[in-house]
Amino acid sequence: MEKEINPTAESLPEENASVENISEKISTPQEAEVKPKKVRGRKARKALEAEIAASKPTIYINNVDIFQRNLLVLPHVNLTIQQGEFVYLIGKTGSGKSSILKLLIADEKVHNGEAWIAGYNLATIKKRHVPYLRRKMGIVFQDYQLLQDKTVDENLFFMLRATGWKNRAEMEKRVTQVLTMVDLHTKGHKYPHQLSGGEQQRVCIARALLNDPAVLLADEPTGNLDPITSEEIFQVFHEINKRGTTVLIATHHFLMI
């Protein structure tokens, strides 16, 4: 199911904010306060935490204020995204889209309210656990951020080794799989400068898929691309979503949707 969300401050009421959907209205009212269960012992606490995490949607933001460099840009944000959904986060530059994504990857703190992604409580997550969180999500930015002195294959092997992969045969198999997903299976030997802008962004998408993420987040992934190439990149995201991956794309290119 595809949703389009506009995160501008004007679309968020001051009280009990809901998110205005261009094609439908998604309403996430404030939850009634529930007194936490009293548990004793480390195992019991962990079991309760796991139970709570399992009950949450893939992405869940409840009454959270979104900041940019200590400046409040979006008050009382509520957002619920279920597993397998495809959501566009639409807004002009500076409207808070990127700040929402930074919060979701634990680059920004949760100052109030409640925020969860892929079973992790962003309000309480410890720094040492952030790398584990990010292995459960794929992240694609506007800038390609590829290693220019390495081939496409080498860029992907580098990421696999950085995230704990060791078996060469398994790594080669996974690289082939993700490059096939983005229709670049014949380009593994090429260097980034030998690829078009659209092809480089496809490599970044393939890199984001290496660890089979539950969630794929993209921040202005077509910002540097022409309209035709942008449309092709959006189609790649849709194909990924059809395989069951939750996709959240922040973009100002609402005409491309």
Predicted regions and their residues:
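Conserved ABC ATPase signature
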Residues: 191-195, 199-201
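Catalytic Walker B motif of ABC-type/P-loop ATPase nucleotide-binding domains
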Residues: 216-219
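Conserved signature/switch motifs of ABC ATPase nucleotide-binding domains
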Residues: 190-193, 211, 243
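Short coil-to-helix segment of the ABC ATPase nucleotide-binding domain corresponding to the Q-loop/switch region
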Residues: 149-158
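ABC ATPase NBD coupling module
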Residues: 122-138, 168-169, 240-242
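Conserved ABC transporter NBD signature motif
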Residues: 113-121
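Helix-to-loop junction immediately C-terminal to a conserved catalytic motif
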Residues: 105
